[in-house]
Amino acid sequence: MLLILKAIILAIVEGLTEFVPVSSTGHLILVSDVINFKGDYANLFNVVIQLGAILAVVVVYWDKLLNSVKDIFAPDRRGLRFWINIVVACIPAVIFGFSLDDYIDKYLFNPITVAIGLVIGGILMIIVENKYRRRSKTKNIYDMKLRQSIFVGMFQCLALWPGMSRSASTIMGGWIAGLSPVVAAEFSFFLAIPVMVGASGLKLVKSGFYMTNIEFIALIVGFVGAFLVSLVVIEKFIKFLQKKPMRIFAIYRIFIGAILLILAIFKIVTI
């Protein structure tokens, strides 16, 4: 039952943090360290709950995704442009992700690097939002230009550092490229589908598939939990972006990251 409890905790953490700019991977690393959830099974579990979160994107945006497929052959080819933008934006992360995956897993998946990523990412969010949020020109995702998707894709590579946040990186890239807050967030959500499915597939292959019955049950609990929490968070986050700045997330990141670094520097705790 302890494993099930850990699964529920981590599923909630994943669902709450995957699509907001605070780094779900960073939070999973920190919480896993606190509840002593480590090893090969833990790595597999984290992959599976991320897939649950991705399924939530598909469900929330099912109509828009379906219409974008139908619109591939529309006279204005807007559906085709949409999918070309998604594919192009994925390329940088695919290249760097596959090339650096082992290095990242070995050297960057620890609380200290997460804390550094949280602080740096938070500072960047404040700077970028203050300068670029109100300069947006593209207010419809179908109007995105190829250069904008390339720029967002390059920024997504920042998220290879745990703690930086894929959501924060892509939204910041979108703002600088001229996307409105909502378009930047939605493009970030859509971009998460192929990128995270690919990354999760790679880790699944490396992890293997053997597990006990209770471990399998915990996987199901985690998957469903992350899916349900993500459903709520996605819709709430879009409504939040329409009215309020993301500064609160940046402040939260800087606060948590700074506390962790102070604790480590003064050796109050070992992280």
Curated annotation (Swiss-Prot):
Q: What does this protein do?
A: Catalyzes the dephosphorylation of undecaprenyl diphosphate (UPP). Confers resistance to bacitracin.
Instruction: Provide the E.C. number(s) assigned to this enzyme.
Output: 3.6.1.27
Recorded source organism is Clostridium tetani (strain Massachusetts / E88)
* InterPro entries named among the record's database cross-references: UppP (IPR003824)
Q: What is this protein called?
A: Undecaprenyl-diphosphatase
GO molecular function terms here? Answer: undecaprenyl-diphosphatase activity
What family does the entry list? Belongs to the UppP family.
Question: Biological process GO terms, please?
Answer: cell wall organization; peptidoglycan biosynthetic process; regulation of cell shape; response to antibiotic
Mark the transmembrane ranges: 2-22, 42-62, 80-100, 108-128, 149-168, 175-195, 214-234, 248-268
Q: Which UniProt keywords apply?
A: Antibiotic resistance, Cell membrane, Cell shape, Cell wall biogenesis/degradation, Hydrolase, Membrane, Peptidoglycan synthesis, Transmembrane, Transmembrane helix
Question: Pfam families from the entry?
Answer: BacA (PF02673)
Q: What more does the entry say? A: Bacitracin is thought to be involved in the inhibition of peptidoglycan synthesis by sequestering undecaprenyl diphosphate, thereby reducing the pool of lipid carrier available.
